[in-house]
Amino acid sequence: MSKPIDLKTVKIFEPLKKKPSFENKIFNTLNSDLVYEVLSNNSNETVNLWFKLQQSWCNNAYSTFKDYDSYLILVYLVNQVFQKYSDRFQYLTFQEFYEKTELNIDKINLIEISKELNIPKETIRRKVNFLQDQNIIFRKGKSIFFNNAINRVQKPSNSKKMMANFLEKTSSILGKEDWFGRPFTKEEIEKFLDSYFTICWQHWLRLQIPFLVRHRTFFGDLETWNVWGAIGISQFTDYSKQVKGRVVEDPRTYADLYLHLLRHTPKNGINASSISEISTIPRATVIEIKYLLK
């Protein structure tokens, strides 16, 4: 069972400190449909930064254990810790979170993790034992904890910067709409991510984990997906160079851009060595993934 909240020391997320008022019914919210429409119609400007963010995060994920499934289970457990803070209306800064010597996970439910990640229960068991062997998690009494090894295996310093770059661009695009307000700089965004880290990264992992699970289910494993993604990034780079300077009549939606990429024939292909360099997956493994050619 979780420990009770110490009301003397609990740190409440700033927006929640504002006293509700029936007289003042101004809420700082955005219409998600409008946001999606604007960003979708400007996909040409954002997709490159999105690819860089995903590639950076995925490369770090693979490099940590040379095994995507172990890392996926790790971030799932980390997100449980984030969720626990959120449920208590608490948050930690980036520095505070990674300065902790241990973090309580409470318990690990193999069946629940297996269902959420679409990975067999016995595989989950082996990967959790691997994390324990690596001294990343440990048991104390009836509870399970992360120790401070989390600092070296799951500290998204570079991904945080990449995300700030991506959000700066989306902010710049949305800032042209009268309902959005002023755009934000990457420095402001990264400072916000640092200050409200466990809240922000919980939202990121709520997007990222299902995103990875979908691709793992479709491709069979995330290594194959990352190889496919490296080829896609190469094709997008070639496409961008060829269309640069063209007069484009209308903004392309993400769906339109995706179709253009599928129809595009690049001037130059990409070899196994380059795919390995982009994805950090060994060249021998890249060569073994042959069914993408079919």
Language-model features and meaning:
Residues 140-151:
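Short, Lys/Arg-rich nucleic-acid/phosphate-binding segment
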Residues 64-71, 80-95, 218-224, 234-257:
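Short helix-coil-helix linker/hinge
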Residues 118-133, 280-292:
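Short amphipathic alpha-helical interaction segments
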Residues 152-182:
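Short, amphipathic alpha-helical interaction segments positioned at domain boundaries
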Residues 87-93, 99, 105-108, 125-126, ...:
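Short glycine/proline-centered loop/turn elements that form peptide/ligand docking sites
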Residues 96-115, 262, 268-278:
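A short alpha-helical element within helix-turn-helix/winged-helix DNA-binding domains
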Residues 2-71, 176-229:
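N-terminal leader segment of winged-helix/HTH proteins
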Residues 132-142, 294:
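A short, conserved structural fragment
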